[in-house]
């Protein structure tokens, strides 16, 4: 099955329904990530090491993949696993690792609001790399849809939420921090461009790899997450002294790890049978879930910018996936 241009022609209704349900679940888990992290805060900060959460998430994905392989081993083709095909996934893990660490490093050179707005440029970089690497040409309508998607993300990041009784808009919970003037350094701008390029490249390269290899998705995931665990284990060990692996973890933190692990597996299905563009729409639509959960759980107020962003996302989906 393939979703290159929206829709799933050739799929039966039950499979179409399962695909839609999977995208909705992924959207919900993406949107819940920042509010759940906010609920983990103790005295205004996250009580555990970020590298611990990333490592545990990768380890959870690896264990789930291993379990899936054990359950479905009888349906596998005969012969030894093609271990040589595992090597390319080391680059995927490296790109994802660099991307995750750049997010943290960027905060030193710009304020959170500037990062939230400008990081939407990764939509454009992903689209360009998608066309170049996969040789998939976008129509004018689809290009306009992605521009609207970028505008929606920037609009929401600039002021989709605010504290009750405060007339000044507030960035999403993931970016919330002590008041800081808007700023970005020249080095920060260069790193942001690098971040957007790596973000797009990691997505498109992984999609290309998964589609070209005639291997079960569970085995491909096993390769990817094995390298991911090794990489993040090294980063965690090399991070210097700090809290232990599970120190500071709570029920909310465990829910963050589990939801991100499950979402990673769902995204692998999208990369295998859908496209990097589909992933962009899932991430953008998750802004709506993020805002609603922030309003309910964190008592933040929705602003006009949120409703404008929602309208732009809806229009972008209509342009990209609507009848042409």
Curated annotation (Swiss-Prot):
Broad class of the protein's primary localization: Golgi
Protein name, entry field: Probable UDP-sugar transporter protein SLC35A4
Any GO MF annotation of the entry: pyrimidine nucleotide-sugar transmembrane transporter activity
Stretches that traverse the bilayer: 19-39, 53-73, 86-106, 143-163, 181-201, 215-235, 251-271, 276-298
Topology term for the membrane: Multi-pass membrane protein
GO (cellular component) term, any one: Golgi membrane
Gene name in the database record: SLC35A4
Lumenal-facing ranges: 40-52, 107-142, 202-214, 272-275
Cytoplasmic topological segments: 1-18, 74-85, 164-180, 236-250, 299-324
Function: Mediates the transport of CDP-ribitol. Does not exhibit CMP-sialic acid, UDP-galactose and UDP-N-acetylglucosamine transport activity.
Protein biosynthesis found in the keyword field: no
Subunit (UniProt): Found in a complex with SLC35A2 and SLC35A3.
